[in-house]
Amino acid sequence: MRHVFAAVMVAGLLTGGAHGQQTPSSPDSCTGLAQLALPDAKVVSAEAVPAGGFTPPPSLNPWTVGDPSFYKTVPAFCRVVVKATPSADSDIRIEVWMPAAGWSGRFRGQGNGGFAGEIDYRSMGAAVARGDATAGTDTGHSAGGTDASWALGHPEKVTDFGY
């Protein structure tokens, strides 16, 4: 899974330009990331999200979304959605967000708490607002922070979660 993160990040940063670049990257350079060939993974979508234009999906954990009005303050960014399947039982969702302009040169990997199986969109939005590129994952399952029922009978999902 680390290779998937690395491949998406390197490709995105190469198309986005140099450290601290103030010139916006082309929306085409973002959507072009949909053509990336990744081992055991597929880019589901790559889209240029306009400033204030992101709406988070419904959530099992309200803390991963926060106040929906917050997203109106998030600047434009490139959103890459990946599905990784290193095993037949794997279903890992990954998102990588890269600022459209003003990249700080920093990358922030966004984690989850407990057994949480959701992408922390609130923290990713805050990272992009600071000019950081960021990535998050659901660690291969969809569940609340105290629900581990997804692991019963699914040793590969446990491996995905622990990786």
Residue ranges and their predicted role:
Residues A6-G16:
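Bacterial N-terminal signal peptides
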Residues H19-Q110, I119-R122:
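Catalytic-loop region of hydrolases
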Residues S104, N112-Y163:
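Cap/lid segment of the alpha/beta-hydrolase catalytic domain
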Residues M1-V4:
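Positively charged n-region of N-terminal signal peptides that target proteins for export
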